Amino acid sequence: MTKKLHIKTWGCQMNEYDSSKMADLLDATHGYQLTDVAEEADVLLLNTCSIREKAQEKVFHQLGRWRLLKEKNPDLIIGVGGCVASQEGEHIRQRAHYVDIIFGPQTLHRLPEMINSVRGDRSPVVDISFPEIEKFDRLPEPRAEGPTAFVSIMEGCNKYCTYCVVPYTRGEEVSRPSDDILFEIAQLAAQGVREVNLLGQNVNAWRGENYDGTTGTFADLLRLVAAIDGIDRIRFTTSHPIEFTDDIIEVYRDTPELVSFLHLPVQSGSDRVLNLMGRTHTALEYKAIIRKLRAARPDIQISSDFIVGFPGETSDDFEKTMKLIADVNFDMSYSFIFSARPGTPAADMVDDVPEEEKKQRLYILQERINQQAMAWSRRMLGSTQRILVEGTSRKNIMELSGRTENNRVVNFEGTPEMIGKFVDVEITDVYPNSLRGKVVRTEDEMGLRVAETPESVIARTRKENELGVGFYQP
């Protein structure tokens, strides 16, 4: 009988990436097949996020539902991973003694051994350590699911913003070696992936080892990824302004594979609040980065993150945030009301902004962002946009759907063989959450670099050291 695995994932794209790796790993080691139905599963895994308000209570609420399944099937294994697991550790079992496995973001590769241990002596396992880069060495080969893929290039963050739990739950910054990253992307390209999204909590701080022992920069890595045949679109998230150096901006000037869209969190437009947040940059420095980016890539669009109602934020501080939003002319952005995360310095600050005031500020900010995003969309009317076709449209299964460089969903009439390829589409209609268009050019008419396969690139550039060990030299 086929053994089944159910994974519920909350949080960021890094968590989505981690969950996909868990599924691949347990399929390779135990033959577990994914199921969307928790009641069918032999193993239930909850991959948690601690960023949002009441994250811990949300976890225990979900575990309470799974407890009923455990009572019906005592052999069911329940595991909790992610940032809440890293933060709470043994406390999870104190409140939910039926949980068998607690693991952190850096120990998910040990899941096969943890499951074997629980199956063997029924003893619970808790492993929330930080074994640095070992996780990536233990994961199976990547499996593509469509024309886009996430690739984690680093873990952790050293910035210690006062409101953020990431350095405590995922550890400090650790970068993967460049050849490991490039080989994973080449494997994905060989399976039909055309767009990669490079992931990290502070992705532009990547400083990975090169094949010759030197340390590469994020700008170096972007150019190496762009050189992989078959990869025609590169995204990355999430960035920190303090690490957004001029060499990265130069990549926007000369590397067309890098999309004309950037998510660069700023959180506030007030220097006083930025200082309280521990952001280590000013609003003016942020705007200087945007000015240089637009000089290098005039059509680039910027999205961001904002926190309203941070302790000590005055009406004047909020107005400075609104001015920054207008000055930069942000596109789609994420915004949240401040809520203290246990264990962070901000949790000890006096939360002195009334709740109703926080809600009002959030409403005003989101209305302005939505207006600007809609204006950006309207500018696209009548233009020709390059779309990576991801599959059938959610609105109409007789149509296709894909995304523009600036992350707009576009629905259009097409043929099945277009899926997984690029098409140029003229935008004919603009809606609040999507665009509509008609195909004006197929990939065969674009002259993209698909003549040389990733396998041939690897074979051509593979070298051996004096011990006969092969390595990939781009």
Curated annotation (Swiss-Prot):
Keywords: 4Fe-4S, Cytoplasm, Iron, Iron-sulfur, Metal-binding, S-adenosyl-L-methionine, Transferase, tRNA processing. Residues 3-120 form the MTTase N-terminal domain. Residues 143-375 form the Radical SAM core domain. One of its GO terms (molecular function) is 4 iron, 4 sulfur cluster binding. It is found in: Cytoplasm. It holds the Pfam family TRAM. SUPFAM superfamilies: Radical SAM enzymes. SMART domains: Elp3. Its EC number is 2.8.4.3. [4Fe-4S] cluster 1 binds at C12, C49, C83. Its main location: cytoplasm. Its cofactor is [4Fe-4S] cluster. Catalyzes the methylthiolation of N6-(dimethylallyl)adenosine (i(6)A), leading to the formation of 2-methylthio-N6-(dimethylallyl)adenosine (ms(2)i(6)A) at position 37 in tRNAs that read codons beginning with uridine. Monomer. This is tRNA-2-methylthio-N(6)-dimethylallyladenosine synthase.
